[in-house]
From Swiss-Prot:
GO terms for cellular component: cytoplasm; nucleus; ribonucleoprotein complex; ribosome. Belongs to the universal ribosomal protein uL5 family. The keyword RNA-binding applies. This is Large ribosomal subunit protein uL5. Keywords: Cytoplasm, Nucleus, Ribonucleoprotein, Ribosomal protein, RNA-binding, rRNA-binding. Component of the large ribosomal subunit. Signal peptide: none annotated. The lineage of its organism: Eukaryota, Viridiplantae, Chlorophyta, core chlorophytes, Chlorophyceae. Component of the ribosome, a large ribonucleoprotein complex responsible for the synthesis of proteins in the cell. The small ribosomal subunit (SSU) binds messenger RNAs (mRNAs) and translates the encoded message by selecting cognate aminoacyl-transfer RNA (tRNA) molecules. The large subunit (LSU) contains the ribosomal catalytic site termed the peptidyl transferase center (PTC), which catalyzes the formation of peptide bonds, thereby polymerizing the amino acids delivered by tRNAs into a polypeptide chain. It is found in: Nucleus; Cytoplasm. NCBIfam families: PRK04219.1 (NF003258).
Length: 170
């Protein structure tokens, strides 16, 4: 009952501009997940970056279930199963980024280019549905919530991962 599992995985590619590059980034996500990505919009105008409010600047996709577990494993293999302590949040989630999408096993296409992406992994225990259901919503108890230490321990057991205290000097 208290085992931790992946609730969802969100893959995000932030291009910071709309147009052709954003469409190609969405195509990369679609090839990777076989799902249609959603576009993220700018919250406010930033003149120095030539971004207008409500302009599409990123694309992301939410993956659940066994497919999410497989994608997390492939992403962590790129990072050599090493994360730093700052990658884990207090609520038991963690995230990391990769520089090139071709490291995940996709073929390089010169017309598409190379995109980096962010992985955000949400962890939960069984019983979290009580907070999301429509009728008789309830709070998840403090002892049942996933903490930062629980998430780190799960990562080390599940993937034989290494958690470093600081980022390695590169």
């Amino acid at each position: 009952m208290r085992e931790i599992r992946i609730s969802k995985l969100v893959l995000n590619i932030a291009v910071a501009e709309s147009g052709d590059r954003l469409q190609k980034a969405a195509k990369v996500l679609e090839q990777l997940t076989s799902q249609v990505p959603v576009y993220g919009r700018a919250r406010f105008t930033v003149r120095s970056f030539a971004i207008r409010r409500n302009e599409k600047i990123s694309c992301y996709v939410t993956v659940r279930g066994e497919k999410a577990y497989d994608l997390v494993k492939r992403g962590l293999a790129v990072k050599e199963f090493e994360l730093i302590r700052k990658n884990f949040s207090d609520t038991g989630n963690f995230g990391f980024g990769i520089q090139e999408h071709i490291d995940l096993g996709l073929k390089y296409d010169p017309s598409t280019g190379i995109y980096g992406m962010d992985f955000y992994v949400c962890l939960e225990r069984r019983g979290y549905r009580v907070a999301r259901r429509r009728k008789q919503k309830a709070h998840v108890g403090v002892k049942h919530k996933v903490t930062k230490e629980d998430a780190i321990k799960w990562f080390q057991q599940e993937f034989d991962g290494v958690v470093l205290n600081k980022a390695p000097a590169s």
